[in-house]
Amino acid sequence: MTQKLHIKTWGCQMNEYDSSKMADLLLSTHGLELTEAPEEADVLLLNTCSIREKAQEKVFHQLGRWKELKKNNPNLVIGVGGCVASQEGEHIRHRAPYVDIIFGPQTLHRLPEMINQIRGGKSSVVDVSFPEIEKFDRLPEPRAEGPTAFVSIMEGCNKYCTFCVVPYTRGEEVSRPVDDVLFEIAQLAEQGVREVNLLGQNVNAYRGPTHDGQICSFAELLRLVASIDGIDRLRFTTSHPIEFTNDIIDVYRDTPELVSFLHLPVQAGSDRVLTMMKRGHTALEYKSIIRKLRAVRPDIQISSDFIVGFPGETAEDFEQTMNLIAQVNFDMSFSFVYSARPGTPAADMPDDVTEDEKKQRLYVLQERINQQAAQFSRRMLGTEQRVLVEGPSKKDIMELTGRTETNRIVNFQGSPEMIGKFVDVKITDVYTNSLRGEVVRTEDEMGLRIAQSPQEVMNRTRKEDELGVGRYHG
């Protein structure tokens, strides 16, 4: 009988990506097929996130439910991975001794051996080490699930913002070799993927080794990915302002595959708070990046992350954040009330903003962002938008759904052969979380792209010195 795997995932897109890789890996090594029902599973995996408050308690609450399943099925293998496992591995083992496997984000590729060890009689396995890039070398070939795909290009972060656990849970920055990234994307393109989202905790810090011992910058990687036949849309997340260099802005100038949408977290608009957060940039420097981007891409829309109620944040500091929001005119945000993360420098600061004040500030901030987002949506009414068709609409399976370049969901009537392709849609209705439209042009009528060699694309950034020797600039 086929064995089953159930994975519960919390947190960021990197965690979602990791979970999909776990599923692919265990299907190839153990024949484990995914199930949505934990009670059907032979292996249960919890992929955790430590960003939100009370992350530990959430983990133990979930494990308590699974403990009952283990009582009924002693052969059930339970594993805990992700950032909470990385931080609290030994604590999990002591408090929940029925957990068999504890693994970190960088050791998920060792899951097959860990499962074999447990089934071979070992009582428990804990591996939360940071073996650098080995993880990617041991994963199976990518499998496309629709026309969009995530591809991890780097892991970890060296920035050590005072509120953040990522450097402690995922380690320092490690970039995948450029050839590995391009090969994975080419494989996905052959399977019908049209849009790729490059992932990393600090994605624009990418410095990928090349086959000849050189280093490929993030800007160069973007151009190489854009040149892969079949890839017509390119996104990336999450980036950091201090790594957002002019050579990346140049890619927006001349690479139409790179979408006119950017998620660039700023966290606060007060320089005093940014300094306490150890962000490494000022509000003015952030605005300068946006100004340069809009000079080359006037239609680009920006989303961000904000933390309100950081230790020491005054009403005046918050007002400066609101001013920044108005000046940049963000289209969307992921906004959170500050809560201390164990082991971070900010956890030692006095948490002196009251919970009521934090909630009030969050409400005010989100209301402003929602107003700005609604204005952007209203401006789209009557316009034509290019939509990548992802499949049937969740609201009405007789309709199709897809996303615009600026990440808006659009629902419309269409035929099944449109799935996985682009259509141009005239926007007829605007709702809070989606748009509605009518198809005016199919992909066959677009003349989408002229094939270009990777060398032609790279030549956009290539200059020659006085001796005729090529050199990259940026």
Curated annotation (Swiss-Prot):
It comes from the Bacteria. [4Fe-4S] cluster 1 binds at residues 12, 49, 83. It is an enzyme of class 2 (transferase). Residues 378-441 form the TRAM domain. It is found in: Cytoplasm. Residues 3-120 form the MTTase N-terminal domain. InterPro entries: Elp3/MiaA/NifB-like_rSAM, Methylthiotransferase, Methylthiotransferase_CS, Methylthiotransferase_N, Methylthiotransferase_N_sf, MiaB_methiolase, rSAM, rSAM_horseshoe. It catalyses: N(6)-dimethylallyladenosine(37) in tRNA + (sulfur carrier)-SH + AH2 + 2 S-adenosyl-L-methionine = 2-methylsulfanyl-N(6)-dimethylallyladenosine(37) in tRNA + (sulfur carrier)-H + 5'-deoxyadenosine + L-methionine + A + S-adenosyl-L-homocysteine + 2 H(+). GO terms for molecular function: 4 iron, 4 sulfur cluster binding; metal ion binding; N6-isopentenyladenosine methylthiotransferase activity. Keywords: 4Fe-4S, Cytoplasm, Iron, Iron-sulfur, Metal-binding, S-adenosyl-L-methionine, Transferase, tRNA processing. Residues 143-375 form the Radical SAM core domain. SUPFAM superfamilies: Radical SAM enzymes (SSF102114). [4Fe-4S] cluster 2 binds at residues 157, 161, 164. Pfam families: Radical_SAM (PF04055), TRAM (PF01938), UPF0004 (PF00919). Its EC number is 2.8.4.3. Monomer. Belongs to the methylthiotransferase family. MiaB subfamily. Catalyzes the methylthiolation of N6-(dimethylallyl)adenosine (i(6)A), leading to the formation of 2-methylthio-N6-(dimethylallyl)adenosine (ms(2)i(6)A) at position 37 in tRNAs that read codons beginning with uridine. This is tRNA-2-methylthio-N(6)-dimethylallyladenosine synthase. It comes from Haemophilus influenzae (strain PittEE). The gene is miaB.
